[in-house]
Amino acid sequence: MKKILVIGGGAMGSAFTIPCIENKNIVTITEPYSKTFIRNLSSKNKFHSALKINLPKKLKFRKFSDNLLKEKFDLIVIALSLSGIDFIGKKLKFLKIKTSILVLTKGLKYEKRNKKILTISEQLKKNYNVSNISILKGPCLAKELARKNQTNVIVANKSIKKAKQISKMISTSYYLIEFSKDIIGIEVCSAIKNIYSMIIGAGQSLNASSNLFQKSVMEMKYLTKYFKGKDETTLGLAGVGDLYVSAAGGRNSKMGSYLGKGFTFKAAKKRFMPNDTVEGEQLAKEIAPFILKKVNKKKIPLMVSLLRTIITNKKLKIKV
C-alpha cells in the first residue's frame, strides 16, 4: 500500500485515481486552480461532472497547499494542463520535493530565450531542478478509464526498473502498462498527435482521412527523430496508438472537420466549440516559431499547413 498524491482534478487526473485506489493505495487528489473543486467533490456521492461518474469513496480530497506537498507521499502525479507546469515546477523547486514524480500532462514548450523546444520533463528538470521524473502517455480517454475499459499506456524512465516500480503501484487488470527509456520520443509523439489529429479530421471521407493518417505518421516519425526520439516510439502506444484515439473522435479531430469544410479556426471555435479546449491549437501557437524556422518544411508539409492555418487564421489548404 503506497501513498499517492494526484495534482489536477480534471477528467484525466480524476479518472487516474480509480486504478490507483483499486490497487489498494491511499490516494489523495487536489486542484490548485478551482476553489469549488474540493467542496463539490467532497459531497457524499463524489460526482464528477466531466466523467459523469461517482468517484471512489476511499478517494481523499485536500485543498492545495505547500504543506500538502511537503507531506510524505510515495508518488506525486502531475495531471495539470500545460499552462500549469510552470506553476507546479516553481512549487516543487521551492519546497525541494524529492518524491518520485509521474507526469500525465501532454505538450511541448518553446523556450524563446534559447530558441529551443523543451519537453515537459526537460522543462521541469532544466528550469526547476526537479529530478526523479517518469512520464505516462498513450491512448487513454478519461471517460473510458473511469468506466474501467481496457486501457494500455506506457511509462517512460531512463531506468526501466523505476518504470516498473511505478507500474506496480498503478496497474490493474484493465489498466495495462508498457515500459520505455525513450522519454523524449514519447513526449514528442504524445504532443504532436494533437496537431495531426486535426489534420486527419479535415479529411471529408474515410478514404481521404486514411491517406492523411498515413502521411501524418510519416511526419511524426520524422519529427520524433529530429528531436532525438526513436523511430519505434512513433509506431507504439504514444505515437500511432494515441493518434488513432484522437483522430477517431477527440476535440482536435472535431475541429479538424470544420477546418476541412472551409471554416477558419476562429470562426469554427466561436460557432461550434466555444467552450471546448483544443489542445492542438495551443500547441500549434507554442511551437510554430520554432518549426517554421528551424525544420525542413518539405519533410512536414501537413504540419506546416496546419500551423500557418492556426497562426494566420486562414482557411486550411492541404496538398496531398
Protein language model regions, located:
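Conserved active-site and cofactor/substrate-binding residues in soluble primary-metabolism enzymes
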Residues: I7, A11, A15, T36, ...
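Nucleotide donor/acceptor-binding cores
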Residues: K2-K3, T99, T151
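Rossmann-like NAD(P)(H) cofactor-binding subdomain of soluble oxidoreductases
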Residues: L55, R62-D66, E71-R147, I166
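NAD(P)-dependent Rossmann-like dehydrogenase/reductase catalytic/cofactor-binding core
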Residues: L55, K193, I200-G201, K225-L235, ...
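Internal alpha-helical scaffold of NAD(P)-dependent oxidoreductase catalytic cores
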Residues: K91, K126-N132, Q150-T233
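Short beta-strand/turn micro-motifs composed of small residues
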Residues: G8, T30-E31, V103-T105, K137, ...
